[in-house]
Each structure stands twice: as structure tokens, then as C-alpha cells.
């Protein structure tokens, strides 16, 4: 699943994976579960880490951890994003993603389109 950032935010209307900042005392897995509840109204079952990435934008550095996960409960809703989509790895080139996701997208393509 990918989410389109709201137009008024930095990197507005670009696509990304759902997520957000880890709060004090949280693990990365707990943060992902919380963010998905807040942003999509779903509960996740979080699996293994797919990959970690550090990306430097001119205005900030982001540390991304992409997990394998499934929706355990709920139907995704657009609570904070402009749009949400389920896509396959073949559809990745049809979307404009945040630059921080480029390395992750390459790995997804290499892993699932062999």
C-alpha cells in the first residue's frame, strides 16, 4: 500500500509508504502500528524488517525502516493522506514517490520482479 502526501505538506502529492516518527519509549514496530491506526484506521500485524534506509533531504535527514506487515483488522481509510492505493511492484513506475523511498522501491522491484 502506498499513500499520497497532502498537497500542503513538504513533498506534497508525492507517494510514500505509511509511517511516521518513533515516539519516546516506542519500538519501530509499535510506532508503525500507532501510525497506521492514526493515518489509516487499521491494525497491523508487523513482520520482519524488509530494509532500512537513511536519506538526506536539504531540510532534514530521514531514517526509514520498511517492514513486512499485514492488516489484521479494519479497512484502510484516508484520514491524513490525499489518496491511498494498493499497487503491485510492476506498477511502481506509474507513481511519483518521495526521493527517500527510491532505494526501497529498487529493492522491491529486484526482489519481486525477477
Regions found by a protein language model. Name each.
Residues 7, 22, 54:
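Short, glycine/serine-rich, charged loops/turns that create anion-binding
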Residues 17-49, 88:
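The catalytic Nudix box helix
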Residues 2, 48-51:
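A structural microfeature
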Residues 43, 51-75, 85, 108:
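Active-site-adjacent beta-strand/loop module that shapes the phosphate/pyrophosphate-binding cleft
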Residues 1-16, 44:
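N-terminal strand-loop-strand
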Residues 3-6, 20, 70, 87-89:
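Generic beta-structure capping elements
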Residues 68, 77-108:
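NUDIX/MutT-family hydrolases
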Residues 109-114:
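Generic C-terminal helix-cap and adjacent flexible tail
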Amino acid at each position: 500500500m502506498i499513500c499520497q502526501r497532502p498537497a500542503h505538506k513538504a513533498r506534497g502529492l508525492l507517494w510514500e509508504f505509511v509511517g511516521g516518527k518513533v515516539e519516546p519509549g516506542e519500538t519501530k514496530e509499535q510506532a508503525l502500528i500507532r501510525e497506521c491506526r492514526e493515518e489509516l484506521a487499521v491494525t497491523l500485524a508487523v513482520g520482519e524488517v524488509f530494509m532500512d534506509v537513511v536519506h538526506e533531504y536539504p531540510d532534514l535527514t530521514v531514517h526509514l525502516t520498511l517492514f513486512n506487515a499485514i492488516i489484521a483488522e479494519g479497512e484502510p481509510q484516508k484520514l491524513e493522506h490525499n489518496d491511498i492505493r494498493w499497487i503491485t511492484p510492476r506498477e511502481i513506475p506509474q507513481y511519483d514517490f518521495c526521493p527517500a523511498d527510491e532505494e526501497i522501491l529498487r529493492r522491491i522491484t529486484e526482489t519481486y520482479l525477477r
